[in-house]
């Protein structure tokens, strides 16, 4: 594998690969199970903490309609109904499920 660095010389820098996805079981109001999260550098315990206690990511979750590049898009909503940010950025469940 080549280094993602744009320099023309052979780079000694390592190619960084995310760890293989682990199956997470997180039940949220009976919604379902989280199978894949596109941020491999967040610890699963920290994700659970963010869902429970961080109001920045919202107390409710809105699942929007699919688009060509993201079959499922999950965003956090705060208690006033405003979209406050993406819950763990984009959680792309369908792409993972249909790629299998």
UniProtKB/Swiss-Prot annotation:
Record keywords: Cytoplasm, Glycolysis, NAD, Oxidoreductase
Residues annotated to bind NAD(+): 39, 64
Domain of life, per lineage: Eukaryota
Record field: catalytic activity: D-glyceraldehyde 3-phosphate + phosphate + NAD(+) = (2R)-3-phospho-glyceroyl phosphate + NADH + H(+)
SMART domains: Gp_dh_N (SM00846)
First-level EC class: oxidoreductase
GO biological process terms held by the UniProt record: glycolytic process
E.C. number(s) listed in UniProt: 1.2.1.12
Binding residues annotated for D-glyceraldehyde 3-phosphate, in chain numbering: 89
Pathway: Carbohydrate degradation; glycolysis; pyruvate from D-glyceraldehyde 3-phosphate: step 1/5
Location within or outside the cell: Cytoplasm
Example of a GO cellular component annotation carried by this entry: cytosol
InterPro entries xref list: GlycerAld/Erythrose_P_DH, GlycerAld_3-P_DH_NAD(P)-bd, NAD(P)-bd_dom_sf
Subunit structure: Homotetramer.
Official protein name in the record: Glyceraldehyde-3-phosphate dehydrogenase, testis-specific
Gene: GAPDHS
């Amino acid at each position: 594998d080549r280094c993602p660095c744009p320099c023309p010389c052979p780079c000694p820098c390592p190619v960084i690969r995310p760890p293989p996805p682990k199956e997470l079981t997180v039940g949220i109001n009976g919604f379902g199970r989280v199978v894949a999260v596109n941020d491999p550098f967040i610890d699963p315990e920290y994700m659970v903490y963010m869902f429970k206690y961080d109001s920045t990511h919202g107390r409710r979750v809105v699942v929007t309609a699919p688009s060509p590049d993201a079959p499922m898009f999950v965003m956090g909503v705060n208690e006033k109904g405003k979209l406050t940010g993406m819950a763990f950025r984009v959680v792309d469940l369908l792409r993972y499920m249909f790629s299998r």
